[in-house]
């Protein structure tokens, strides 16, 4: 496993439509392992293959309280329900977060890392991850959904925590 460099805006790969994974071979298994390691190293909740410079339809993400990362190859969102206001960031747009609307519930289908077809229905944060990561595969970023520039915020450095109260 290797930690890969995360592509950042304005790198063109982030705006291109990714190609379907033609077959799940050793190179795809390595890519999956590298993406999971990279996501964990960057303390991210999800990662799409284009974010590590590979234009393939593959995403990984961490569901809250799950032991293993979820892998979805050639994902397709088949249903969206409801709406909710969310705050969202992206490893490819460091230093910023935005306020936008996402679906409350998302159902997606695709293949697991072994080529087995499955469906996943996510609500709340999981729905947000499915939508965000799948959009990466079509060159869409969360900033494309912002209603106005005022909805994009720069992350401010945290105040220094006194040594005596650090964990």
Swiss-Prot record:
Its EC number is 3.5.1.88. GO terms for molecular function: metal ion binding; peptide deformylase activity. It is an enzyme of class 3 (hydrolase). Pfam families: Pep_deformylase. The keyword Metal-binding applies. Binds 1 Fe(2+) ion. Its cofactor is Fe(2+). The active site is at 133. Disulfide bonds: none annotated. Keywords: Hydrolase, Iron, Metal-binding, Protein biosynthesis. Belongs to the polypeptide deformylase family. PANTHER family: PEPTIDE DEFORMYLASE. Removes the formyl group from the N-terminal Met of newly synthesized proteins. Requires at least a dipeptide for an efficient rate of reaction. N-terminal L-methionine is a prerequisite for activity but the enzyme has broad specificity at other positions. This is Peptide deformylase. It comes from Dehalococcoides mccartyi (strain ATCC BAA-2266 / KCTC 15142 / 195). The gene is def.
């Amino acid at each position: 496993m290797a930690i890969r460099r995360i592509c950042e805006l304005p790198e063109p790969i982030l705006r291109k439509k990714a190609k379907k994974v033609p077959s799940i071979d050793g190179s795809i298994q390595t890519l999956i392992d590298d993406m999971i390691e990279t996501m964990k190293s960057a303390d991210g909740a999800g990662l799409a293959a284009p974010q590590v410079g590979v234009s393939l339809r593959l995403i990984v993400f961490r569901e809250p309280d799950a032991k293993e990362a979820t892998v979805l190859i050639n994902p397709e969102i088949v249903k969206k329900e409801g709406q909710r206001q969310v705050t969202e960031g992206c490893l490819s747009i460091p230093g910023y977060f935005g306020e936008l609307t996402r679906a409350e519930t998302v159902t997606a289908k695709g293949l697991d890392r072994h080529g087995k077809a499955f469906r996943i229905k996510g609500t709340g944060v999981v729905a947000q991850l499915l939508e965000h990561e799948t959009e990466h595969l079509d060159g869409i970023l969360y900033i494309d959904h912002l209603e106005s520039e005022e909805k994009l915020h720069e992350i401010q450095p945290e105040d220094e925590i006194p040594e005596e109260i650090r964990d």
